[in-house]
A protein has these predicted regions:
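OB-fold ssDNA-binding interfaces and closely related basic DNA-contact patches used
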Residues: 394-453, 492-500
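Generic detector of solvent-exposed, compositionally biased contiguous segments
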Residues: 1-19, 189-192, 349-362, 416-435
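An N-terminal structural lobe/cap that precedes and organizes the functional/catalytic core
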Residues: 1-82, 90-97, 102
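Short nucleic-acid-contacting surface segments enriched for D/E, G, S/T with interspersed K/R
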Residues: 426-427, 467-487
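Charge-dense, low-complexity intrinsically disordered regions
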Residues: 97-398
Length: 500
């Protein structure tokens, strides 16, 4: 069965430069949405969206109804800021999505892209988590917007490290005024200071368009979608492939093309969805970020205005929750970089609002709702940071019709671990080139051995469980020791393993 997908993006800066990140309208997040359905459902979705557009025909601009019809100031306190007409419009739009919809969302930090380029020579190790360090640097710059650091980054990247060191040292000193709230931040900043010794000047600060399509490719694989087309909103010069389209093709997506949104309702739907989510996330960011003249060590909560909701406004949160969390849910449905606090906060807000049945439920303990919501968001951020510590890749199993799948080294791994052959060892030393070590369900250790014509996966003797779990833990901390030659020694009732 063929599937039709449509792509659009929001909060995109074509070039990243000093004026980009210091402008009044700047927002660090870049968002993309890809929506789609089976081709036999295309007509039904098209009819629904055309009915929606005609109902609000007076809102069209240049013949199109897109997310620009909702202005940022109309979401300054989230859906609580919307008037009745806009509540009705968004409710009608969200209702177009049903269980036949496939929705993929991507979010990235513009500053994270710059920092990743500057520190591209650094790698995770068992001794230092570079992902966490990059996260801390990005969060510090996005949250505090230190002018001297940002200016040094663009005027003279060679001066960036010195400026960042000065800024972090200053923040550590200021944070000591309230270690109850800032102890964790200080620990992170102190760790970052330990590695700020060398930095490579980036080759380019142009935006990298690949990440959103890498995640979408994983989403398609996880869903088992093989026959599809992807249509992107056309940007740039006519007759010339955009960087976005080139990136989509580079990542292996097939049947990709771009077109004018006025000719394709699916692109307009993607624009509406990603635009509304982008504006909502932007308002959430500004509401949770301290202003320049506010005390930096104070806890920042959403104002009570976010929670003065009517039943209709609350229903919008519940509808959007259904779209983001429930319709054709998947591990890769929402894809982001390491620094994705705004996205995580947005998901936390949806989760929090969804548990209310009516606006009266919110009113029962109204004054405490900002605190309760903050706790919900904080827990999500904490879980995200814990997941970030896990360095082992998560990959979709592409073919679930067979009784086995192929691991990253191309070896057969049976779903029923009892069918996995055991590595046969003779008395004395047995040498193998080991590609990887893992743990199957039930705690059974596995090893992938280099072989011809294909690598082979075996069960290891139970005596090597502790050895295997240690290596998995090291890999999870960023220290992968394989491939490498391993000597398995069988002596009496014991088996030993030595990495050469």
């Amino acid at each position: 069965m063929k599937y039709c997908f449509y792509y659009d993006e929001s909060e995109h800066s074509r070039f990243i430069k000093l004026s980009t990140v210091t402008g009044e309208t700047y927002y660090d997040g870049f968002l993309a949405a890809i929506i789609g359905w089976r081709s036999d459902h295309e007509t039904a979705f098209e009819q629904r969206y055309h009915t929606f557009e005609e109902k609000y025909a007076d809102r069209k601009k240049k013949g199109e109804l897109k997310s620009g019809t909702i202005k940022p100031k109309q979401l300054v306190h989230g859906f609580a800021s919307l008037n009745k007409a806009n509540v009705k419009l968004l409710g009608d739009f969200f209702s177009i999505f049903d269980e036949n919809s496939y929705i993929y969302l991507f979010c990235a930090s513009k500053i994270e892209y710059v920092i990743t380029q500057l520190f591209k020579g650094y790698r995770n190790s068992v001794f230092f988590d570079m992902d966490a360090a990059r996260y801390s640097i990005v969060k510090a710059i996005v949250t505090y917007q230190p002018t001297e650091v940002i200016e040094s980054l663009y005027k003279s990247p060679a001066e960036f490290v010195a400026a960042l060191k000065t800024f972090l040292t200053s923040r550590i000193r200021l944070n000591t005024e309230n270690l109850e709230l800032k102890a964790q931040e200080n620990t992170a900043f102190e760790s970052v200071l330990c590695v700020l010794n060398n930095v490579d000047v980036p080759q380019s600060l142009d935006w990298d368009y690949h990440s959103q399509f890498v995640g979408f490719g994983n989403f398609l694989s996880s869903k088992g979608v093989l026959d599809y087309s992807v249509l992107l909103d056309k940007e740039g010069e006519a007759g010339v492939e955009s960087k976005t389209l080139i990136a989509a093709k580079d990542t292996g997506l097939k049947n990709c093309d771009e077109a004018d949104s006025i000719d394709h309702f699916g692109i307009r739907m993607a624009d509406m969805l990603v635009g509304i989510i982008g504006k909502l996330m932007k308002s959430l960011y500004h509401s949770l970020t301290p202003t320049q003249d506010s005390p930096r060590i104070a806890k920042t909560l959403l104002s009570k205005e976010w929670f003065r909701l009517t039943d209709e406004q609350l229903q919008l949160y519940k509808q959007l929750y259904h779209i983001v969390f429930e319709i054709n849910n998947d591990w890769y449905k929402v894809y982001a970089g390491n620094y994705s606090d705004d996205l995580v906060s947005f998901l936390g807000l949806l989760d929090f609002m969804n548990h209310f049945n009516s606006a009266k439920d919110i009113e029962q303990d109204f004054d405490m709702q900002p605190e309760y919501c903050n706790s919900c968001i904080f827990q999500r951020l904490k879980n995200h940071f814990e997941q970030m510590k896990n360095k082992l890749p998560v990959e979709p199993v592409k073919d679930q019709k067979k009784d086995f799948f192929r691991n990253r080294r191309g070896a057969k791994v049976y779903y029923d671990v009892d069918r996995q052959p055991t590595l046969e060892l003779t008395k004395g030393k047995n040498a193998f080139v080991v590609q990887s070590v893992g743990i199957a369900k039930g705690g059974i250790p596995l090893v992938t051995i280099e072989a011809s014509p294909e690598n082979l996966c075996y069960r290891l003797p139970v005596q090597l469980w502790e050895w295997a779990i240690t290596l998995v833990s090291l890999a999870n901390a960023g220290e992968d020791l394989f491939p490498a030659e391993v000597i398995f020694t069988k002596a009496e009732n014991r088996i030993y393993a030595d990495i050469i």
